[in-house]
C-alpha cells in the first residue's frame, strides 16, 4: 500500500479596499487596492470601456488606479472592473470573479428659453430652463445691475421675476 499526499489549495476571494464609486464626469476616482483571502495569489482585473467614456484603464493587477473619467453622454455610465485571483504554485487555482463598479454621471448642459429676453419695467421674466440629463436641478444667482430691482437668487426650472428699471436707460 502506498501513501499519497494531496494538497488542496483554497479558492481565493478578491476583496476591494473601498465601496463602489459614483463620480461626476471629469472628476478623479480614488485608487482601489485589491487583496485576497489567500496569501499566495496573483490578482488581475480587466475593464471593458463603454462608448461615451474616456480616461478609463482597461487592465491591471493589484490596484485599480486613480482615473479622470469623462462621460460624453446624457446618461450615467457604469464601468465594471472584473477581478480574479489565482493561487500560485504547482496547482494554480483561479477563484471566482469579483466586480467593482464606478458610475460616471454626465455633466448637465443647461438651455434657457428664450436665451435673450427684453421686457418692460415692472413686467415679469419668463425663462424656462431645461437639460437633456434626466434629474437635473437648476439654481441661479443674479448680479446687481445698476438700477434694476426685483431680481433674486432662486431655483427651479422657471425664472419668473418682476424687474423694475428705475433709470431712464435700458439695462
Residue ranges of model-derived segments:
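Extracellular low-complexity Ser/Thr/Asn/Gly-rich intrinsically disordered segments
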Residues: 1-171
Amino acid at each position: 500500500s502506498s501513501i499519497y499526499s494531496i494538497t488542496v489549495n483554497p479558492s481565493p476571494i478578491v476583496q476591494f479596499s473601498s465601496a463602489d464609486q459614483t463620480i461626476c464626469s471629469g472628476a478623479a476616482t480614488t485608487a482601489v487596492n485589491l487583496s485576497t483571502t489567500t496569501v499566495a495569489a496573483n490578482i488581475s482585473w480587466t475593464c471593458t470601456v463603454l462608448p461615451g467614456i474616456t480616461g478609463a484603464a482597461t487592465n491591471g493587477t493589484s490596484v485599480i488606479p486613480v482615473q479622470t473619467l469623462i462621460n460624453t453622454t446624457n446618461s450615467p455610465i457604469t464601468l465594471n472592473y472584473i477581478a480574479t485571483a489565482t493561487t500560485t504554485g504547482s496547482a494554480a487555482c483561479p477563484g471566482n470573479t469579483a466586480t467593482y463598479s464606478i458610475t460616471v454621471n454626465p455633466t448637465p448642459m443647461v438651455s434657457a428659453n428664450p436665451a435673450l429676453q427684453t421686457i418692460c419695467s415692472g413686467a415679469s421674466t419668463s425663462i424656462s430652463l431645461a437639460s437633456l440629463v434626466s434629474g437635473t436641478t437648476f439654481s441661479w444667482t443674479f448680479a446687481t445691475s445698476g438700477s434694476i430691482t426685483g431680481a433674486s437668487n432662486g431655483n427651479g426650472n422657471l425664472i419668473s421675476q418682476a424687474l423694475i428699471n428705475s433709470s431712464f436707460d435700458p439695462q
